[in-house]
């Protein structure tokens, strides 16, 4: 029976799956003559559950469930070179112990015009570290319109409570003025937290207070910029894309007077998962000295990947980062690829689509795109067969759509082959 199971699985795993199938038969859960089939199905399900590459044909560039920003050759090469011994906490110039905050964090701070930086394992951890360091036992002012919930049910008030800080809600959900903050100030206030609403947008009768206005206060202003757009001007691109309108830039927050800015590494920055904190050196040094900094620190591979990403921005080569390359690929180029795929697969049509950034960024803003679509008798059957080939499409009404903006050109042939193999399920 073991030889019938996926040979990529270790022998011990295949043996355990076979035992589970036999046990199921003994309990009467399956018929005795279905043991082999049950074991094969268990192996198939496990093989698909294990981490591995997938073709993201959803049109969601920063798909959280599919790993957000894909890494390019430069970042992967940097991570590979750091996989052995590396000077993660060693100063080669002096021959003494160093700090893991001297590499990627410092370069990322330079890239957005800040004095210093530190890297932790995600942006929620970054906010947690800032609040625990600067506001434990004291009050934090937050606009009611910025008490956001991020993915997985985690909410800003709950994160704040875990740090021992006290939440002081300011203004109303739709309108918060500078005068609202003024009235809430007291000696108990440690800082003002401004949260960029990167996963939703309010329109209509709304008002908010800018970082520059808040920076007039004596209390430090901390900005959770979330999405991680380093610079609103996007100097690494030929022109600023229209779908980036109103997106908050880290550099602009620093220039406006923010004491600290936190953001994600695997969103618009285009790097590995990380939480990045940049700002004034005095505050960053306090963060580095807090016990939580060690508990939340990033590993050497993450730091190496971010170092390469920072190099790309500092050298003006960020357009080569996969996220930006895919997001800015001309629609005409996508259409040419779609026509090639459609020409080789019966029943497949070229369609204009709309991609999105995803990952809790740029809500409501679409990116014009192009892909291929199929109208099968059974949408569920076709998508299941594509997923078995590790291809994740999206479903629009009764169509299965593969949006090429999120498909690497190197995977076009693989996508076409999978669609041909499912031809019987697409008509």
Indicate where each model-derived feature is located.
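Long amphipathic alpha-helical segments
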Residues: 1-46
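Conserved PLP-dependent catalytic core of the aminotransferase class-I/II
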Residues: 142, 302-303, 307-358
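Conserved C-terminal alpha-helix-loop-beta "cap" of PLP-dependent enzymes
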Residues: 335-411
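N-terminal glycine-rich anion-binding loops that anchor highly charged ligand groups
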Residues: 7-26, 53-55, 187-190, 312-313, ...
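Short Gly/Ser/Thr- and Asp/Glu-enriched loop/turn motifs at secondary-structure junctions
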Residues: 55-59, 268-272, 367, 394-400
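Conserved PLP-enzyme active-site core in the AAT-like
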Residues: 94-300, 304-307, 418
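Glycine-rich phosphate-binding segment of PLP-dependent enzymes
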Residues: 18, 57-58, 68-93
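Glycine-rich, N-terminal phosphate-binding loop and its surrounding beta-alpha-beta segment
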Residues: 27-65, 69-71
